[in-house]
Amino acid sequence: MLSKFKRNKHQQHLAQLPKISQSVDDVDFFYAPADFRETLLEKIASAKQRICIVALYLEQDDGGKGILNALYEAKRQRPELDVRVLVDWHRAQRGRIGAAASNTNADWYCRMAQENPGVDVPVYGVPINTREALGVLHFKGFIIDDSVLYSGASLNDVYLHQHDKYRYDRYHLIRNRKMSDIMFEWVTQNIMNGRGVNRLDDVNRPKSPEIKNDIRLFRQELRDAAYHFQGDADNDQLSVTPLVGLGKSSLLNKTIFHLMPCAEQKLTICTPYFNLPAILVRNIIQLLREGKKVEIIVGDKTANDFYIPEDEPFKIIGALPYLYEINLRRFLSRLQYYVNTDQLVVRLWKDDDNTYHLKGMWVDDKWMLITGNNLNPRAWRLDLENAILIHDPQLELAPQREKELELIREHTTIVKHYRDLQSIADYPVKVRKLIRRLRRIRIDRLISRIL
């Protein structure tokens, strides 16, 4: 059993977090990507004071164009609006994985700026590390006036369900002046005005090697840049705590670590990529040993955004969903006893050829973590991540919380035995060969740390 002292240490961490009081009527849950798109467009069109869009990317496709056009239109209608977009510096200047870097998102931002003279919608490129593989802007949240529309989604056709296919995420709108001010000021001070951050809608922007030293210093500064605010809520009322972090010792990571053992009945986790840091796996095993329930909802390998159908040309990146499945199979084989007793429930999400991008945690009925953090080594060490921790001690959000989980579970099947998952021997020949080659040179471990 977890000693009283240790449990108190975890609970103490949560109790001491500064909390901002939140009205239950000012929290909206959305349950589908199309609703998220419509809400975002409505909020942009009705904004009175500020629009700050932060995302990994804003893609040059129908979905992304709809958003950028709406931002230009809002600025044209109300020139006094403070409108800004922040995306990852490296991601914006390359093609999609496996495609050449011609006509990139950054080129599109430049064209939009040239086609709209006198309408300033700055797009800032944020370099979290000198190379994309070593860290990206994974901070989430669209701050519009006194609201934060929060999702792990980026902005493109599938995330916005612009056409047939969708990528499933979580979507919440929180109206809270204090929290939106804290997030807006932090983004302005620590990201927008950060060294190494340059406008992508400027054709004369520097090349990455020219700002390498600035990027390194910027990353160092971000490690120490937490939100600083006084809470105004106690531990008995509905509250929100914004969190931000870069690096394994961040307050966000510490909070995730302390949140899990506070489950008295049940912990539920969603992640699209099953590659949990060892420290979180230990937390899960400890909960199971104490008789607590753990539910993990992950995407089926075919619902992974890196999955390549067998009838399409194979690329190395297409091995990733199989590596995640190997991780899950290994995890389940260790814990099959708890699967047999229904104490550990693992669900695989699959809905036709749509993809799964959900992340977050639910601890009992009282805590909810909404985040873009994939709960993997990459999120733990390399990317700039953030989250909003919701404390609901009076269960005021219970109906929405239950509905959200019910809908997430709708397209899932429960894994009853680790052998229900394919083993390497069952994989397509090219995948099998690649994985065995990676294992021979021990590079699979390195890959798991950066993916």
Swiss-Prot record:
What topology does the record note for this protein and the membrane? Peripheral membrane protein
Q: What is this protein called?
A: CDP-diacylglycerol--serine O-phosphatidyltransferase PssA
Family as reported in the entry's similarity comment? Belongs to the CDP-alcohol phosphatidyltransferase class-II family.
Q: Which GO terms describe its molecular function?
A: CDP-diacylglycerol-glycerol-3-phosphate 3-phosphatidyltransferase activity; CDP-diacylglycerol-serine O-phosphatidyltransferase activity; phospholipid binding
Q: Which residues form the PLD phosphodiesterase domain?
A: 27-224, 239-451
Q: Which GO terms describe its biological process?
A: cardiolipin biosynthetic process; phospholipid biosynthetic process
Q: Which organism is it from?
A: Escherichia coli (strain K12)
Where, per UniProt, does this protein localize? Cytoplasm; Cell inner membrane
Which Enzyme Commission number(s) are listed?
2.7.8.8
Question: Which regions form coiled coils?
Answer: none
**Functional pathway:** Phospholipid metabolism; phosphatidylethanolamine biosynthesis; phosphatidylethanolamine from CDP-diacylglycerol: step 1/2
Sorted alphabetically, the keyword list is:
Cell inner membrane, Cell membrane, Cytoplasm, Lipid biosynthesis, Lipid metabolism, Membrane, Phospholipid biosynthesis, Phospholipid metabolism, Repeat, Transferase
